[in-house]
Amino acid sequence: LLMGGGIGVTPMIAMAHRLHALGAAFALHYSVPSRAAAGYLADLAQAPWSDRVHLHVSAEGSRADLDAIMASRRPGHHVYTCGPERYMSAVMAAAERAGYPEEARHLEYFSLPEEPDYVNHPFTLRLARSGREVSVSAEEAATDALAAAGIHVDVKCADGLCGVCRCGLVSGAVEHRDFVLSAAGRATSLILCRSRAAEPDGVLEIDL
């Protein structure tokens, strides 16, 4: 399920094109307050997958019934959403009620959400495969310290939004600062571009 609220439909459209190219089944639900406020209507009508688009217009009384939409869930289904925070929260709540497991509920962001005033501390990364240790200063990200040590890690957004730099966590207490991992994912992984040891001078052993 692809759930787009307002301009948040933009990344959902990109995902729909990709899913169609892969021959995967999907449905795209687009919620807007009015047709005048809706973008992409002509593009969606002409898309080769236009029969999978469901438009919900509040001003016309066709506001999305999120619980009814989520009722179509089958094992293995995933739900992705992007839009105003209130909309995404409602979608995630409905998905949870419908039984979507946490790892099957995904939030997409246009920009970095608000976050606490974090305090950076130096810490150490221990690479499980070699036993090598890499020091991370308070002024740099783990990915920067690894790069300086000659260890390449793929990075895309550098904001903890995309998950490209996800790495397995072997041991250590992590201050997770990403916006992509579920609670279950955080038990076994971390996002290297953002997350740090939870305590000053802590040691994180990672699967590198």
Locations of regions flagged by a protein language model:
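Short, charged low-complexity linear segments at domain edges
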Residues: 124-149, 166-175
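FNR/FR-type flavoprotein reductase catalytic core
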Residues: 1-131, 135-138
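Iron-sulfur (Fe-S) cluster-binding modules
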Residues: 102, 198, 205-208
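Local cysteine-cluster metal-coordination motifs and their immediate loop/turn environment
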Residues: 11, 147, 151-175, 186-199
